Amino acid sequence: MIGIKSIASYVPVAGVDNYAQGAKFEKNEEFILGKIGSAFLPRKDADQETSDLCVEAVNALFANNPQLKRESIDVLIVVTQNGDEEGLPHTAAIVQDKLGLPTTVAAFDISLGCSGYVYGIYAIKGFMEATGLKNGLLVTADPYSKIVDPEDRNTTMLFGDAATATWMGENPAWELGKAKFGTDGSGAPHLKVTDGVFFMNGRQVFNFALLKVPAHLHELLEDSDLQTSDIDAFCIHQGSAAIVDAVARRFEGEPEKFIKDMVETGNTISSSVPLLLEKHMLNSSWKRVAISGFGVGLSWGSAILQRP
């Protein structure tokens, strides 16, 4: 059975002081921490491309797992909507070359935003099991610094750059359980890029998260024959502190189980869930975790991860 064996990440050291940004827009520390949730927003270097972030994360994964060899990688999937240059060729091909992976590797991108990790782990699991592959890499990297207007108070205080790499293979540390997905393209205008600049209708996105995610998680638990008490933690997309707090309250069941950890990262799009899993789940005593990603599309996905 294919599942999650290990997760590693790359978070740029350089970045933006969000308190300073907030002061520019007359927002105080209480607002920055309480509503936004991030005091610091990592930023890639100007000469770093999306593929470079991917390479850093994968190299960290190799360093943490010396038994995993480059020549053993069968498939590489990159989840991004802000790939290298103008998006052609696909970023996964560039990452394959920069990493020196074998040319026998299957490599492709998945164009999804904040729901991308949940979709991605099931997509790569299905691809690997259908084709009999042994070792896969699911990489997330969506540097919004490429598209966010630093003068837009609705977006510039939210997003951080980061990348993650997940080793998918047999004899996993975490198995993939039930999952549920959804899409509502009528909400596409609420999160979009026009002429290279990102736009977000924050109120609509907040309402979407509040209405959709708690109910979706309850449906997932019901489909899995699980109770809230069976879940050790809920690792949901870190859209903002306000969103995580509101979803936890609306869920109405052990809100303290909802992990909120974005003070030093910001909203890292498809990397936010795996960053939580790497930091809080991998070396924990947890037995079962619920994850959920939601955003651009509008798109959402929720799933159960469990120890074998």
List each model region and its residues.
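Short, well-ordered amphipathic alpha-helical segments that serve as non-catalytic structural scaffolds
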Residues: 28, 50-65, 209-224, 276-277
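Glycine/charged-rich beta-loop-alpha catalytic/anionic-binding loops adjacent to active sites
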Residues: 38, 75-78, 97-111, 147-149, ...
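Buried hydrophobic positions in well-ordered alpha/beta secondary-structure cores of metabolic enzymes
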Residues: 4-6, 32, 61, 76, ...
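Claisen-condensing/thiolase-fold acyl-transfer catalytic domains that form or cleave C-C bonds
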Residues: 51, 55, 83-84, 89, ...
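Condensing-enzyme catalytic core mediating Claisen C-C bond formation in acyl metabolism
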Residues: 1-46, 150-211, 215, 219, ...
